Amino acid sequence: TLINIRDTEEFVVNIVSEEFVEEMVACSTDFDSDVDEFEISGLTAAASQKITPPRVEKAKVSYECTLNQIIEIGDGKAGSGCVVIGTIVLFHIDDNIYDNGRILLNKLQPVGRIAGNEYTRLTNNFEIIRKIKPDK
């Protein structure tokens, strides 16, 4: 993925939902840059509108992005990596998870990778009211 981002200066961020987490894991290996991860995972590509790389059809939220910079962190040993910073040029939101200006997280059911083989899901949400402007 990183090689392709460097080469094209474009990328898509797809928010992974529980319904296709297994397919996502199937393509989360360090494949050579010429390997078609859609073919490996069984996911279907959907054409992007503003950039060349496709997005994941099943993704309920996708961001089409252009590259701003890549920041390398570490010395190349275990724990090192890169932070990719981009500009969102278009985002796609499934109408079924969007209501009155808000994304409905219970319908999106996003999954996040913590580290290694550990993942997390939103299951026990709670709300904390914060002040807009602190009192002095």
Segments predicted by a language model, with ranges:
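Basic, polyanion-binding surface patches
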Residues: 1-136
